[in-house]
Swiss-Prot record:
Single GO MF annotation: GMP synthase (glutamine-hydrolyzing) activity
Record lineage: Archaea, Methanobacteriati, Methanobacteriota, Methanomada group, Methanococci
Alphabetized CDD domains for the sequence: GATase1_GMP_Synthase (cd01742)
Subunit relationships: Heterodimer composed of a glutamine amidotransferase subunit (A) and a GMP-binding subunit (B).
NCBIfam families, A to Z: guaA_Nterm, PRK00758.1
Record protein name field: GMP synthase [glutamine-hydrolyzing] subunit A
Classification via InterPro entries: Class_I_gatase-like, GATASE, GMP_synth_GATase, GMP_synthase_A
A Pfam family that the UniProt record links to this protein: GATase
Disulfide bonds: none
Function: Catalyzes the synthesis of GMP from XMP.
Reaction(s) catalysed (UniProt annotation): XMP + L-glutamine + ATP + H2O = GMP + L-glutamate + AMP + diphosphate + 2 H(+)
């Protein structure tokens, strides 16, 4: 099972449905859920930090990003929370928009296996990662955002600014499936 921490984003239920579509069970929990409670459930194989409107109401996710022993995928706000947890910088986007964006994959990696080097993704660019934390590397960028995706160099921690769970994102299910593979799921 994948635990989805609900940061109040409008697409949290889309994450749940997208995982169900690819055959992975998931559970949406409040973003105040303690890490010990999540990790004490032996069925949990990974954590997704959802998008949301307010960093201040999602501070527990910083503790989870720093201390979880499970793989983590941060989406939009979740991505930004991972950056903050590890000492990166988040700020207002120069091009504040909510639209389809062409994403360019800079580095082959587990998250973008079987995904083209360029694809269209639905993205919210109100805030974004301005500086990648030490120990992380940029995996993808767009013309309006230099950090569309990042990964910790030694831990299975990923962040994406765009929304793989939204139907408009090409290869979104493939990206979610790739994260689930990192968590130990097998697909035919």
């Amino acid at each position: 099972m994948i635990v989805i921490l609900d940061n109040g984003g409008q697409y949290v239920h889309r994450i749940h449905r997208s995982l169900k579509y690819i055959g992975v069970s998931s559970k949406i929990v409040p973003n105040t859920t303690p890490l010990e409670e999540i990790e004490s459930n032996k069925e949990v194989k990974g954590i997704i930090l959802s998008g949301g409107p307010d960093i201040e109401k999602a501070k527990n996710c910083i503790d989870i990003a720093l201390n979880a022993k499970l793989p983590i995928l941060g989406i939009c706000l979740g991505h930004q929370l991972i950056a903050l947890a590890y000492g990166g910088e988040v700020g207002r986007a120069e091009a504040e928009e909510y639209a389809l964006t062409k994403v360019y994959v800079d580095k082959e990696n587990d998250l973008f296996k079987n995904v083209p080097r360029e694809f269209n993704a639905w993205a919210s660019h109100k805030d974004e990662v301005k500086k990648v934390p030490e120990g992380f590397e940029i995996l993808a960028h767009s013309d309006i955002c230099q950090v569309e995706a990042m990964k910790h160099k030694t831990k299975p921690i990923y962040g994406v600014q765009f929304h793989p769970e939204v139907a408009h994102t090409e290869y979104g299910n493939e990206i979610l499936k790739n994260f689930c593979k990192v968590c130990g799921y097998k697909f035919e």
